[in-house]
Amino acid sequence: MHYFEGLSFFMTLGLVLIVAFILNVFQKSTYYLSLLFSVVMVYFVFIKTPDQLIALLGFVVLGYILMQMTSKLKDRKKTMPIMVLLAGLPLIVVKVLPVFHVNGFGFLGISYMTFKLVQIIIEIYDELIEKPLSVLDYTHFLLFFPALSSGPIDRSRRFMDDWHKQRSRGEYLELAGTGIFRLVLGLFYKLVLSGMVFQHMNGPVEKDVTYLIGYMYLYTAYLFFDFAGYSLMAVGASNILGVETPMNFNFPFISIDIKDFWNRWHITLSTWLRDFVFSRVVMRFMRKKVFKKRLTTAMVAYMINMTFMGFWHGVTLDYIIYGVYHGVLMASFEWYQKKSKFYKKNKNKTWYKITSWLITMHLVMLGFLIFSGKPLLWISKLISMQ
């Protein structure tokens, strides 16, 4: 069984959501139903790969210990970086070992679970979380089945607030109706539209540069329908359970600049990076007076932030280049916004917005082409044909 794949999963999901709907209509909590199904799903998904199941359980236990230790430490300022490093260490090992042709002990969803765990640890340090989560709440948050494999990346405080929120029957029915719509739309995106696009992407790599251009457009459409489809299904299932899991996409292809794009694409990832990487790098640089100008600080922070995002996807050349590429785009646009008189004069004009949109979309699609790894394959084929 796989998350949001196959008849067996959707039949089981349908049964659980029907029970959840009935319970919510009668204003009964679905907390334990959701927790039970999340644990059961982990068992059925990983039962054929016991090494991954053991690794996942080990990660959950390690995370709980780190959370408890962080809450009890007196000098958190010195120890917090160590706790964050320990929380991220399994993911680092999983990402790095394949570079040396060694199989790691990774498991489905480790990247997303790591960010959830790091969020808890940092927010305990920031005293936004006053006391550590209970065993059940912690396990439920980490293993919440709709978002386990590919997000969206929720925050623990928001997640737990949803379970404690008292909704009227009318409020729940409105949320459930939205959830059903999102679930059906996500199914259509992922099973129909992404499948249709994928059929046109399976041809052999051709040496003509027009092949790469065509592939760039196709891959962009495929990536959106596949990933947005999964995210919609995850959010829709969450809504029917009574959880308002945050949306991951907000019409990204109407973005008029690269910052606007990252406010609309993979939103829970970009906001996580903004809150826990970018803003903290900026604060540290300003506190240490690393750079004289705030603009330089912001530009360097964007480079670090997006390069980190590339490594999070994987320690391979295409992912790293993708991260650096978006770091350059974000840093360059930051400079352009702050320094360009042309931008300040024309930014609100219709012709400028249309031109900016067209340029932004092609820069974004070029990034997706890099992300796909196809340019490296194309270059290697050209070299082999010499």
Region spans (language model):
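Membrane-embedded transmembrane alpha-helical bundles that form the catalytic cores
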Residues: 1-386
